[in-house]
Amino acid sequence: MSSSRPVFRSRWLPYLLVAPQLVITVIFFIWPAGEALWYSLQSVDPFGFSSQFVGLENFVALFHDSYYLDAFWTTIKFSALVTFSGLLVSLFFAALVDYVVRGSRFYQTLMLLPYAVAPAVAAVLWIFLFNPGRGLITHFLGEFGYDWNHAQNSGQAMFLVVFASVWKQISYNFLFFFAALQSIPRSLVEAAAIDGAGPIRRFFRLSLPLIAPVSFFLLVVNLVYAFFDTFPVIDAATAGGPVQATTTLIYKIYREGFTGLDLSASAAQSVVLMFLVIILTVVQFRYVESKVRYQ
């Protein structure tokens, strides 16, 4: 079997086609990452006019800071809850739509609506519903004797930001899961049904293994989403409180850099977060992807 390769009339045309993407990558990704790495090794004054090379002192100070370590473990817990809860809920809804015959179009449209809402707006929406004094959901919980006040209860605050973050990401996950389920040949599903496999068994024995590559892709995407893109939700919903119970690494970087004007500490934290995400992604590609290959 021979494979054909595209032939360009000019030897410079391939480089010209790739150049815009390379420029965007360098300007918006590589350059800022390099700047963060450089500032993490400096002691910079709040106005950025002068700096002094201090080596790894900023990193040493980080890991002796109890507030930073608390934010680190809060980030791990928050990211795990957002990632796995979002994937499970989205997969459940996608599986339901895959089996629904009547009204499936309306159901699909309804599931895609949260993706059109900005993260900060999603947070404000759920703040209204969970408002301790006038919220519809808190009023319902009060009827059962449950007192809700996420401004004073750290567990409730964590639940609120996780819930809002998952709700915002459901549409994205749902779209990929539903497309993956729809791509499974109907002949395989019908053959399994003829062999006596029920809907639940067909899903776990047939559908789930076949959509494993998509599940792995969404695992990586949701992990990055939980680490970085949930900042507007946390900022609008709890501002990292109460008592830093919902302060993640990305929010602490913002607070140190833009509120505390400690550019060196903020840069060091961003470098640690960057390498943490890189390590987790590499581990996933190395050990998880090998388990999603199928013939």
UniProtKB/Swiss-Prot annotation:
What are the transmembrane regions? 12-32, 81-101, 110-130, 158-178, 208-228, 263-283
Q: What is the lineage of its organism?
A: Bacteria, Pseudomonadati, Pseudomonadota, Gammaproteobacteria, Enterobacterales
Which PANTHER family does the entry mention?
Answer: BLL4140 PROTEIN (PTHR43227), SN-GLYCEROL-3-PHOSPHATE TRANSPORT SYSTEM PERMEASE PROTEIN UGPA (PTHR43227:SF9)
Q: Where is the signal peptide?
A: none
The yes or no answer to whether the keyword Transport is present is yes
Q: Which Pfam families match?
A: BPD_transp_1
Q: Which InterPro entries match?
A: MetI-like (IPR000515), MetI-like_sf (IPR035906), UgpAE/MalFG_permease (IPR050809)
What is this protein identified as? sn-glycerol-3-phosphate transport system permease protein UgpA
Residue ranges, Cytoplasmic side: 1-11, 102-109, 179-207, 284-295
